[in-house]
Amino acid sequence: MIFPITAYIEAALGLARYDKLEDGSFSGEIPKLKGVAAFGQTLRVCESELRSTLEDWILVGLRLGQKLPVLAGIDLNKVQHGRLATT
């Protein structure tokens, strides 16, 4: 069983864009999620940092009651019977 938050994270990471910078390091972002960006000396480190940033972004957004974008039909803004609803 995949929990909605896990599916949301995987869907978001599927939208990630990575660029190799002039100094050889990498930047990554998820354009649909404002402010979700990361940097790393290698692509693997950048991917890991982006996942961590995304997880924090989701938790802070939910905690503050901010409306998160629906991704892949997953709406983390709705809770039904103690479970996150999917559309």
Predicted regions and their residues:
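Short, charged, surface-exposed hinge/linker loops at domain edges
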Residues: M1-L15, S48-T87
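A short, exposed loop/beta-hairpin motif centered on an aromatic-Gly-Thr core
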Residues: K34-V45
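Exposed, low-complexity/repetitive linear segments and helix-based recognition motifs
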Residues: A7, F26, R44-C46
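Structural detector for hydrophobic anchor residues on beta-strands
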Residues: G14, F26, V36-A38
